[in-house]
Regions:
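Cytosolic ends of transmembrane helices, especially the final helix of ABC transmembrane type-1 domains
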Residues: 258, 282, 330-359
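An intracellular "coupling" helix at the cytosolic face of ABC transporter transmembrane type-1 domains
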Residues: 39-44, 148-152, 165-174, 178, ...
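Membrane-proximal cytosolic tails and large cytosolic loops of membrane proteins
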Residues: 1-36, 78-83, 626-655
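Hydrophobic alpha-helical segments in the permease module
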Residues: 102, 106-113, 117, 210-215, ...
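ABC-type nucleotide-binding domain
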Residues: 366-367, 373-655
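Transmembrane helices of ABC transporter permease
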Residues: 52-59, 179-230, 304-315, 319
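Short intracellular "coupling" helices and adjacent cytoplasmic loop segments at the cytosolic face
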Residues: 15-24, 41-43, 129, 137-167, ...
Length: 655
């Protein structure tokens, strides 16, 4: 795939910020922002295509305006047989006035016009779609450059709709502007010149006034409709977001029997969309009716003037037909003009929203002169780190600790202590508010984000997979890995045997977010792709907390293999998984209050020991419940677990 320089994206982002700042002003800001993509400096072939398309457009309009003359000549020739007024003998009109010749000329002109238009549109499509591709790619890349905070605060469904509509808006505005708007203006000018020279100033003035009034009414009515379309788009985005959110949480909806509740939420959004859509269609009817009245009045006026001139002996019958043909030819571009204005206005709205995204500056960005991270051993050090998501609520309060190269350090603590925040800071999803984080002595703010994240592998608590094959999801850790390397990673993650039982093996589709796989299977895929990545630093962010005890033990064995000889940070919920850690850090309210090995912390009798004892008591209670349920099941069902009398206890035992 062809790549485009990030500097272009930067220029577009700068233009986008200028557009957002001056949104109430000139909408030509959008055109200025988009023009470099229609007239690309690095593509002389596309520039030549634009120029040639405009030349073809000019020839097509000249042929279009010439077509009514063939009507005039044919009509005058036919009228001669009826004794009507005809052009004087010897004139060009007389010589070309034979009905057959005039009709053939009309046919040739129409064929030429059609061919010129189609060739022009076919050629310009390459320019338009190249602009769409570049802008869509730059916007997509910019979205990935934006901070985690931006994505957490935005609705994914709404964001994808913004990208989709922005892409379509760019396509529409380039096509409508250069292939419809500009040719229509040229045709208007040519028709006025013909009326002024072939007839007189009255006809030109009448048509000019009609065009001006038609466009004024169209602009005012369309501005009114735009407000309605905005409301309709917002309702559509809201309904679409609710639908995506509900379907992504399909199982949760089923757990709580909330189908009717979800349908009600969706229907309320669709009701708002319905009202806005009805208003949109009503306003469109008003617009079309007004346009028809304005054009019909002007057409009738010109025909009356031509009829009076014929009666006065100043015009021929062919002139009457020519005026009618010119006016009717104007109706098509005029009607398109209304549609063009509506589309351009709507496209501007859609592009504005895309520009809003482009105007967002990344919260975390590479500093000028940032160098790649040079990993020698992978030691990590946090020095008096202060961090907050909200300035009024500090999460980490002067946190300091070290993870020696090749060692495993676990971070534990109650909910809200700041455990997962540490992993996000290490990956530099956020910058610290105070202190610094170093890897092998290098401040992570001074190195490139790409090199930093390339050195770190993550196995998260909630693994989300791409809606693709198992092979694709494992190979995501290293796209250039061979099939054998992928299989070896799967064997180390203890998922190769499971994959072998699937009918499609490694090319099995995992479904949306990997929902076709169980939690344990998804975790093994995540472990396999981390093994394939082979990073010197590993973060296990509560990687087994969402799994049952049996699956947890199996996954833990795979994790132990991955962590061997790597600098490893374990964010732990279940303390039984980190008893062998080289050092355990105990956080509470963003502060390090204890550290040491498992034995040292237990002997100290502090918060860690309290958390450990609490978890052990909970585990023993679950074991007692499970055993009681098993005995009850054997008594009632002959060894078959049937605990229908106490489903709550059964669920608690399995949780």
């Amino acid at each position: 795939m062809q790549r485009f320089a990030p500097s272009r994206d930067g220029r577009l982002a700068s233009r986008a910020r200028a557009l957002v700042v001056g949104r109430g002003g000139d909408r030509l800001r959008v055109a200025r922002a988009l023009w470099p993509y229609v007239w690309p400096a690095d593509r002389p072939d596309l520039k030549a295509t634009v120029v040639f398309s405009l030349v073809l457009m000019l020839f097509a309009k000249l042929v279009t305006v010439a077509m009514p003359f063939t009507y005039k000549w044919a009509t005058d020739a036919l009228a001669a047989a009826a004794g009507a007024r005809v052009p004087p003998a010897g004139t060009l009109a007389f010589l070309l006035g034979a009905p057959v010749v005039a009709t053939l000329l009309y046919g040739l002109a129409r064929v030429a016009m059609s061919l010129l238009v189609q060739v022009r549109e076919g050629m310009f499509a390459k320019v338009a779609m190249h602009a769409v591709r570049r802008l869509a790619l730059n916007t997509f890349e910019h979205m990935h450059r934006l901070s985690l905070r931006f994505h957490l605060e935005r609705k994914t469904g709404g964001l994808t709709r913004v990208l989709e509509r922005g892409r379509l808006g760019i396509e529409n505005i380039t096509r409508m502007t250069l292939m419809t708007f500009v040719p229509t203006i040229v045709e208007f000018a040519l028709v006025l010149v013909v009326l002024l020279l072939a007839f007189d100033w009255r006809y030109a003035l009448a048509v000019a006034l009609m065009i001006a009034l038609y466009l004024w009414f169209t602009v005012r009515a369309t501005d009114w409709r735009i407000q309605i379309r905005r409301a309709m788009n917002e309702s559509d985005s809201d309904a679409n977001t609710k639908a995506i959110d509900s379907l992504l949480n399909y199982e949760t909806v089923k757990y709580f029997g909330a189908e009717e509740r979800e349908a009600g939420r969706y229907d309320r959004s669709m009701a708002a969309y319905e009202r806005a859509s009805v208003n949109s269609y009503t306003s469109l009817a008003v617009l079309n009716a007004g346009q028809a009245v304005i054009f019909t009045v002007a057409l009738t006026g010109c025909m009356v003037m031509a009829g009076l001139d014929i009666v006065a002996g100043q015009r021929t019958l062919g002139d009457f037909v020519m005026v009618n043909a010119l006016m009717l030819q104007l109706f098509i571009p005029l009607n398109f003009m209304g549609m063009v204005y509506r589309e351009i206005k709507q496209s501007l709205i859609d592009i504005e929203r895309m520009m809003d995204v482009m105007a967002q500056q990344p919260e975390v960005a590479d500093r000028p002169g940032a160098k790649p991270l040079a990993v020698s051993g992978g030691s990590i050090r946090l020095e008096k780190v202060v961090f907050h998501y909200d300035p009024e609520r500090t999460i980490l309060k002067g946190l300091s600790f070290e993870v020696p190269a090749g060692k495993m350090v676990a971070i534990v603590g109650p909910s809200g202590a700041g455990k997962s925040t540490v992993s996000r800071i290490l990956l530099r999803f956020y910058d610290v508010a105070g202190g610094r984080v170093t890897i092998d002595g290098q401040d992570i703010r001074e190195v490139t984000q790409a090199s930093l994240r390339a050195a770190i592998g993550v196995v998260p608590q909630d693994t989300v997979l791409f809606n693709d094959t198992i092979l694709y999801n494992i190979r995501y850790g290293r796209p250039d890995a061979s099939d054998e390397e992928v299989r070896e990673a799967a064997r180390m993650a203890q998922i190769d045997d499971f994959i072998a039982t699937l009918p499609d093996g490694y090319v099995t589709m995992v479904g949306e977010r990997g929902l076709k796989l169980s939690g344990g299977e998804k975790q093994r895929v995540a472990i396999a792709r981390t093994i394939l990545k082979a990073p010197p630093i590993l973060i296990l962010d509560e990687a087994t907390s969402a799994l049952d005890s049996h699956t947890e033990k199996e996954i833990q064995n795979a994790l132990d293999q991955v962590a061997r000889n790597r600098t490893t940070v374990v964010i732990a919920h279940r303390l039984s998984t980190i008893v062998n850690a080289d050092n355990i850090l105990v956080l509470d309210a963003g502060t390090l209050i204890e550290q040491g090995t498992h034995a040292e912390l237990m002997a100290r009798g502090g918060l860690y020991a309290s958390l450990w004892n609490r978890q052990r008591e909970a585990e023993r209670a679950r074991e007692v419940l499970a055993e009681a349920l098993a005995q009850e099941g054997r008594r009632i069902g002959g060894g078959r677990l049937q605990s229908t009398a106490s489903p709550a206890l059964e669920q608690e035992a399995h949780s």
